[in-house]
Swiss-Prot record:
InterPro entries xrefs: FAM204A
Gene name of the record: FAM204A
Basic residues: compositionally biased ranges: 98-109
Listed name of the protein: Protein FAM204A
Chain intervals with Acidic residues compositional bias: 13-24
Record region (Disordered): 1-57, 79-127
Amino acid sequence: MWSGLLPPGLNESDVELNSDDDTTLESSELNLQEGKEDGTFEKTEMVDIPTDGPSTEAEANINAYEECPSGIPLNMWNKFQELHKKHSEQKTSASRSEKKKRKRSRKGKLKNEEESHSEQSSSETQWKELTQYFGVNERFDPPVKRKKVEKSGLEKRIDQAVEEWNIEKAEELSNQLATRELGVKIAKAIACHNFVKAKKEAENSQVARKKKKLAWGFEAKKRWETKSNMGYM
């Protein structure tokens, strides 16, 4: 406890805090002296914890790397640093170019898929348009009884393979016959489609000509009517 008058600006609590600090300092000094005398004093290292984390470590590594080590000429060290810098720049540029290539390849794949899809849809529409003309002219063919059917050479070969029990050859020849018949059907359908298209175009052109003639005739009739009315006036 403090006895006596206190200086201005202080109170008893401040004096007590100061006395406590003095006692802690004295006790720490005594402990240090005792440790030195006993030989049991241990050194404690203060470890600074980095506040910025890995960025400060990277900066420290860069600074340590930029320092020229002992025993190496300065010009050689500068040349080595320039080469290292160029190598790192090449790595970054290569990584960027790889990313760009990946993006381009993805765009190219999407574009190819869209083109293939559009081509497939257009081919499907054309096929549907042709299939409606399959067998259109078959009604004009003569009946089967009156029609004299002659087998082709391929059909005769199929019959021969069946008689010889050569199933593989018969299947191969039958596939060829089916593709040939399909090709004939497609050719007939294309011819029919072209004929219908040409007929529609001719009809449309004829209708357009008639419309033009009607328009000119109406105007001439109107002029004639106006002239005749003027004659009566």
